[in-house]
From Swiss-Prot:
This is L-fucose mutarotase. It comes from Salmonella paratyphi B (strain ATCC BAA-1250 / SPB7). Pfam families: RbsD_FucU. One of its GO terms (cellular component) is cytoplasm. InterPro entries: L-fucose_mutarotase (IPR023751), RbsD-like_sf (IPR023750), RbsD/FucU_mutarotase (IPR050443), RbsD_FucU (IPR007721). Transmembrane segments: none annotated.
């Protein structure tokens, strides 16, 4: 048993977070994201929300300070975003320090980043456009 590590973080996720180097990226995706067809390592976190997992990992995870560390998918033309999704994620990520800005990129650019990601964590999140990419930084 390890102390102070959230029980929401599976042993597999903990191992992946430890193996990532600075500049590596991880995606916390909604339940509908095509993770398995994109290529990188996939970790299942069924039944958990993205915001709960972000809240659990942020004490262990240094965000990049040299490049935008947070990326979300922009709405497809003609579609809308629910601003409460980003607000929940920002609240979860600001537990340790102020949350950096979240950059929005189009769907296909996000998929390209996902193909190069270190890992994708599929959650039980059902919010539309509920995917977020985190870029790991250097620990101080």
């Amino acid at each position: 048993m390890l102390k102070t590590i959230s029980p929401l973080i599976s042993p597999t996720l903990l191992k992946v977070l430890a193996e990532m180097g600075h500049g590596d990226e991880i995606i916390f995706s909604d339940a509908h994201f095509p993770a398995h067809s994109l290529g990188p390592q996939v970790i299942r976190a069924d039944g958990l929300s993205v915001s709960d997992l972000l809240r659990a990992i942020i004490p262990l995870f240094e965000l990049d300070s040299y490049a935008p560390p947070l990326v979300m998918m922009a709405a497809v033309e003609g579609d809308t975003l629910d601003p409460s999704v980003e607000a929940r994620y920002r609240d979860a990520l600001s537990l340790e320090a102020p949350c950096p800005d979240i950059v929005r990129i189009d769907r296909y650019a996000f998929y390209e980043r996902a193909q190069k990601a270190f890992a994708i964590v599929i959650t039980g999140e059902c919010a539309k456009y509920g995917n977020i990419l985190l870029k790991k930084g250097v620990t101080p």
